[in-house]
Amino acid sequence: MKFVIKLFPEIMIKSESVRKRFVKILTGNIRNVLNKYDDGVAVVKHWDYIEVRSKNEENRAILIDVLGRIPGIHHFLEVDEKPFTDMHDIFEQTLADVGASLENKTFCVRVKRKGKHEFSSLDVERYVGGGLNQAIETAKVKLSNPDVTVRIDIENDHMMLIKARHEGIGGYPIGTQEDVLSLISGGFDSGVSSYMFIRRGSRVHYCFFNLGGAAHEIGVKQMAYHIWNRYSGSHKVRFVAINFENVVGEILEKIDNGQMGVVLKRMMVRAASKVAERFGIQAIVTGEALGQVSSQTLTNLRLIDEAASALVLRPLITHDKEAIIAMAKQIGTDDIAKSMPEFCGVISKNPTVKAIKEKIEKEELNFNFDVLESAVQNAQYLDIRQIAEQTEKDVVKVDTVSVLSANDVILDIRSPEEHDERPFELAGHEVKHLPFYKLSSQFGDLDQSKNYVLYCERGVMSKLQALYLKENGFANVRVFAHGNIN
């Protein structure tokens, strides 16, 4: 099984030294991610493409899925590589591989060639195309918009028959740009803005300001872990949780109502700047869009930025909400965001849309900055992979089981895409599918006389959701111990 990885076009136009560095980084990223699923995979870099090989045919579906989510890959080709002797041998091998798929179809043959041969690419197209047309009575040659395009790449004495083309997400490989710190709230905007910087080649760390208690933090951790695991699992990143409840309390008590929203955002970027400085991160990323809410006018955004010592970047600044939601759906964060309340909006009833600097600074003189300093000093710093370990400690009242009773139902909480690609079954036991992001709204509708054992491939979401359900009064929930079984 072989895949040929084609690079993002902007990589191709870089200088030779930059291009080599980018390709080297992308090769390492691909290897780091694929080794989690197939420890026998081989990744080899070439000048203008990267080659991925595996002997484990059963891993085909997961490798295709994962390659389609690695930044830096424009598209990749699934190929069947074989040696050949002459043009007739190329024709015979092509007929054996694709003949059945051309029945009752129109087709054309396209060839790319490297190396020294006695024939040209056009010669091969004509010879193979003519041969297929004669050998398959119901097939017909059509050079424009055919039903099937037979693609063959020839390099020296080997031919590659292209079986399928799969699209990547493009962008730059992670690690080719500097790190950023994303202020993630769990809503549509912050998830999408985080993804946009991942796709642009930055390693994205996450900073969460907790305004809503344990349930809010669990939801945000789910989103951050989902984005990291799907799109940037090649790199270690940090998840920073800062309890902002006392900061909000100080604002509610001492700041004029109309200025609360801007002051809160200024406190957030001050705190985030301290975190960024600690880890040598150059920029803060937010999901703000111009005019979307009262604090997001140009006047207010400028005042917010003045409180930051780090560069503040807003990739969604000109995006419509509809476009942002569509992108959230594309990357798989929309359902998580739908269940996440917006806490910032509840603290100011009559927010100003054009804050005055002198007035904001005067209001902040009433604020006890020791409260902000304490919040930053007591921040929780996690390697995002430790979310599972931390949850293991938190979910002390949730049983982990490997042997099931007759009253136990396995609840597969993976996303629909993961469920469809790798269905989970266990002989003798009922398995239901309910995506993790629907548990909060639909778990109560299940038969509560049953015990539900949560299943996901790595166990992280199962443990997070078990904690959430326990906190909401559901005692009939446990975690499946063999969460890494496919």
Swiss-Prot record:
Where do the Rhodanese domain residues begin and end?
Answer: 404-481
Q: Which reaction does it catalyse?
A: [ThiI sulfur-carrier protein]-S-sulfanyl-L-cysteine + a uridine in tRNA + 2 reduced [2Fe-2S]-[ferredoxin] + ATP + H(+) = [ThiI sulfur-carrier protein]-L-cysteine + a 4-thiouridine in tRNA + 2 oxidized [2Fe-2S]-[ferredoxin] + AMP + diphosphate; [ThiS sulfur-carrier protein]-C-terminal Gly-Gly-AMP + S-sulfanyl-L-cysteinyl-[cysteine desulfurase] + AH2 = [ThiS sulfur-carrier protein]-C-terminal-Gly-aminoethanethioate + L-cysteinyl-[cysteine desulfurase] + A + AMP + 2 H(+)
Alphabetical GO biological process terms: thiamine biosynthetic process; thiamine diphosphate biosynthetic process; thiazole biosynthetic process; tRNA 4-thiouridine biosynthesis
Tell me its EC number(s), please: 2.8.1.4
Here the disulfide bonds are 344-456
* Matches recorded under InterPro entries: Rhodanese-like_dom, Rhodanese-like_dom_sf, Rossmann-like_a/b/a_fold, ThiI_AANH, ThiI_fer, ThiI_N, THII_Thiazole_biosynth_dom, THUMP_dom
Does this UniProt record's set of keywords contain Acetylation?
A: no
Name its pathway.
Cofactor biosynthesis; thiamine diphosphate biosynthesis
Q: What is its main location?
A: cytoplasm
Q: Is RNA-binding there in the keyword field? A: yes
Kindly list the places in or outside the cell where this protein is found, as annotated in its UniProt entry.
Answer: Cytoplasm
Active-site residues from the entry:
456 (cysteine persulfide intermediate)
| Residues noted as binding ATP in the record, renumbered to the chain | 183-184, 265, 287, 296
Query: Which domain of life does the protein's organism represent?
Result: Bacteria
- Ranges for domain THUMP come to 61-165
**UniProt GO cellular component terms:** cytosol
Family according to the record: Belongs to the ThiI family.
Show the HAMAP family listed in the entry: ThiI
Function of this protein? Catalyzes the ATP-dependent transfer of a sulfur to tRNA to produce 4-thiouridine in position 8 of tRNAs, which functions as a near-UV photosensor. Also catalyzes the transfer of sulfur to the sulfur carrier protein ThiS, forming ThiS-thiocarboxylate. This is a step in the synthesis of thiazole, in the thiamine biosynthesis pathway. The sulfur is donated as persulfide by IscS.
What's this protein's name?
tRNA sulfurtransferase
Q: Which organism is it from?
A: Mannheimia succiniciproducens (strain KCTC 0769BP / MBEL55E)
